[in-house]
Every structure is written in structure tokens, then in C-alpha cells.
Amino acid sequence: MSNSNSGKVRVAVVYGGRSSEHSVSCVSAGAIMAHLDPEKYDVIPVGITVDGAWVVGETDPQKLTLIDRTMPEVEHREEVRPSLDPAHRGEFHFSDGSLYATADVIFPVLHGRFGEDGTVQGLFALSDIPVVGPGVLASAAGMDKEYTKKLMAAEGLPIGREVILRDRTELTEAEKNLLGLPVFVKPARGGSSIGISRVTAWEDFNKAVGLARAHDEKVIVESEIVGSEVECGVLQYPDGRIVASVPALLSGTESGAGGFYDFDTKYLDNVVTAEIPAPLDEKTTELIQSLAVESFQALACEGLARVDFFVTANGPVLNEINTMPGFTPISMYPQMFTASGVAYEELLDVLVQQALHRDN
């Protein structure tokens, strides 16, 4: 499928965005742009600045990389707008109405709110343009930890204990007894461990809620789960097959300043190591892969997801699902599939073709 003069499929790589994961999105986009097969795909870069302006994107993937702990950002350039008219689907126009480019498929490499949460998926659904990855429902539910866990629990999947704070800052005594200490206080709709605190004494709880509320008015408080951190990727092929990657075991995640896997630990400090495949027994590996696929289906995901677990003495417990996981050079999702025999370039090809197949 292509309408381009080159005969190639035109992929609009949309990245950046208004979320606190803006820079991670930029690095993911740079890696994707560098690995899309140039024999099959023409890349149309579209950036979204931190204040929400849609602009002509960076054409050089090398400029969207992490250099000396400096994360890239979308620069202010000439603005463009996506068409919402199905008769002009895939078109991006300059402010004067002239055409910037026409895409056959959208690859929304957006992490966090205003991108991974169903908003952009809904925007492009208005014009009937195919989009890589899950649709509106799965994206929205996957971003909101409250509803992720409600859907997983409804399917009988193993989850931890949590309490939601909407318009209050305190826990009741019953809730404190339910959760115990330590607890993790998180923005309910966030990622990359931004705004998260590990609380070991209740007198520190209000400060942690304030930090989380700086990123989301809704806060989730979770019991600490003691166990190994394991991740598993899920990939859907154009023919509908859903497969799980080999899992990855993360080590060193407690090295962050707060005693957990925080933003700097994930992307900057280079202290976390991953064993891929995870050194787990066959039964546990198969259970994690099965639970990952069940989680994918519970949220009605399409295309891809990364599912995060704690493996405890009593078995795996689901932590969260990422409907647009990181694609940076150090991200677990592409690394797990590479170890499963699906190279980065092939992984991207499957994802784009799956989106196009859904459209057909």
C-alpha cells in the first residue's frame, strides 16, 4: 500500500509531545527513523513541542539521541496541522494551507499523556488513517493505572493492592493497614517513573502526594511488592497472531535516588542491567508470557505492548502495561524481541504492516 511516487509506504513518525516523557519520545523516534527500512518506507517526521505546537520534524536521526546526559527536545520550526477530513486522510498542511506531506500510516512515538493515552489515537481515527499500536480504548486504559488494574482484575489476573486518591491527600487508617509500608505514590497517568516516591514512613506521605499531583491530579498508592522486576514484550502480527517475547530480568533498579527504578536510573545513569532471556525456570517463563498476552487482550490492545511484572515467592504479579513502550537503543521492548529472533528492523516492519492490515 502506497500512494507515493517512490512506491514506498509513507510513515509519519510523530514524536515529542506535552508529556513529561517528551525527551524519551524524541530518542525513541530517532531510533525508529534510523531503523525503518529505507527500501520500503519513506519517513515523514512530525514533531510536537513541549507546549503542544505541531511542527516539521527533524530529518537527521542522529540529532534525536542522548548525548552526554543531554536529552533532545523538539525545536520550534514551521508549524503543520494534520487533516481531520477522511477525504484528505494522512495529509499534513502548513499554516497557509499548503501541503507538507501525505502519510499512509501514523507511527505515534509518543510516551505519556497527550499521546500514549488515546488522545492522538482518537485524533487520527477521525480521518481514518491507520495508526501503529493500540487504539483509543486500550491506550486510555493502559495509561491510567487505576483502569489498567480494574480491567486486569476483572479477568482474574494477579495484581497488587492499591488505593486511588482523587480529591484527598490522606489515607484512612483502614487503607494504611491494607497497604502497609513501604508504599509507592504515583501519578495515576504517567510513565518513565516521573513523579513517583517510595514512602517508608507515613509522615512523608503528604510530600509524596504533592510530588505526584504535580504531574496528575489523580494519585495511585500501591503496596510495595517484594520480588524480581521482569518485563515481557507482546507483538501482534498482520495475520492476527499474538506472541510474547522472551522476558527480561532487571537488576540494579533499586539504585535510584529514591531506592527504586526512577527516570535517571532508566535513561541516564547506566547502572541497571538486564538479563535477556531472564534466568527463570521454564514454567515461570511460560506463565509470564501467558500473563503478558492475557493482559494485552484484557485491555483490547493491538500491535504491541510491554508488560511489567514482579516475580515474587508466590508467583508473578502484574505491575503495569505500556501501550507505546520505549524504542530507544537501551529500551527493553526492542531488546527483548531481538533476543527472541525479531531484529529491530523486522519489528518495525511488523508493526507498520499490522497497522496497514487492520486498515484494510
Curated annotation (Swiss-Prot):
Its main location: cytoplasm. ATP binds at residues 176-231. Its EC number is 6.3.2.4. Pathway: Cell wall biogenesis; peptidoglycan biosynthesis. GO terms for biological process: cell wall organization; peptidoglycan biosynthetic process; regulation of cell shape. Signal peptide: none annotated. Its cofactor is Mg(2+); Mn(2+). Mg(2+) 1 binds at D308, E320. GO terms for cellular component: cytosol. It is an enzyme of class 6 (ligase). Mg(2+) 2 binds at E320, N322. Binds 2 magnesium or manganese ions per subunit. Keywords: ATP-binding, Cell shape, Cell wall biogenesis/degradation, Cytoplasm, Ligase, Magnesium, Manganese, Metal-binding, Nucleotide-binding, Peptidoglycan synthesis. InterPro entries: ATP-grasp, ATP_grasp_subdomain_1, D-Ala_lig_Van_CS, D_ala_D_ala, Dala_Dala_lig_C, Dala_Dala_lig_N, PreATP-grasp_dom_sf. One of its GO terms (molecular function) is metal ion binding. It holds the Pfam family Dala_Dala_lig_C. Residues 149-353 form the ATP-grasp domain. It catalyses: 2 D-alanine + ATP = D-alanyl-D-alanine + ADP + phosphate + H(+). It is found in: Cytoplasm. Belongs to the D-alanine--D-alanine ligase family. Cell wall formation. HAMAP family: Dala_Dala_lig. This is D-alanine--D-alanine ligase. It comes from Corynebacterium glutamicum (strain R). The lineage of its organism: Bacteria, Bacillati, Actinomycetota, Actinomycetes, Mycobacteriales.
